[in-house]
Structure formats: C-alpha cells, structure tokens
Amino acid sequence: MHHRTTATVTTLILCACLLLSGCSARARQRDLIRNDPMYSATWDGIEFLGTEDSKDDGPKPPPVATTRCFAITIPPEDALQKVMATAEQSGWTEDRSSKSSLTRTAGKGSREGGISLYVSTDIIRCKQYPETNFVISIAL
C-alpha cells in the first residue's frame, strides 16, 4: 500500500512540475514579445486600437503570439514602410522574398528561439476591433 501511495504522489508531483515548467516557458515567451519595441511602438497616421493574444487553453495550445490591431489614415504602403523602418531599427531582418504590396514579414533571434513579425493590410485577425485595417503580429 505504501509503495502505491508513493508512486501516486511522485506521479502527481512530476505532472505538476511539467505543467508549471510549460506554463512558465509560455510566460517567458509572452514577456519576450511584450518587451520587444514593436509591441509598443506608435506612428503618426497609424492609430492603435488594442491587442489580441493567442489563447493558452487546450491540451496543445498554439504558438505564443500577439496581434496589435490598428486603423490607418495614411496609404497602406506608407504604413508598411513606417513600421518596417522601426522594425529594422529594433533588430528585425525583413524577409524580402515574401514582400508584397499588402504584407511584410521579418524575423529575429532570441534565447527562446526565433521570433516572427507579420505586418499586413490584407489579412485582418482582430475580431474585437472590427474597424481594424492594419495588423502587426509577433509570434514565437
């Protein structure tokens, strides 16, 4: 009986440790995104509306990501150029092979792995902010 109780307690402790280490890794990743200059940058003609974060629920949550939702009052190409200039100044490297008139992508390394930046006037993912016509997504 004692052996079975010990095994059960050990199993529960291991499960708790695995859960906590996974949760703390996701928390570190969220902090990494929030500490990046692109998370809080602002520009004239690009009005910040709010953010939408990936959900951590479910047995296998999606990658950690934050989408910043904006309404632009300047031409889309100008908005893309302003944002990508700031990204470059902040250490991001633009992926010029995926460049289009509506979308830009960039990447940067970190201790947690690679971070991706996605800037678009085309694919809008902001359900809470229907007036959104420009997004910046940062994902690990």
Give the residues covered by each predicted segment:
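An acidic-aromatic pocket/loop used at catalytic or ligand-binding sites
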Residues: 2-6, 13-19, 23-140
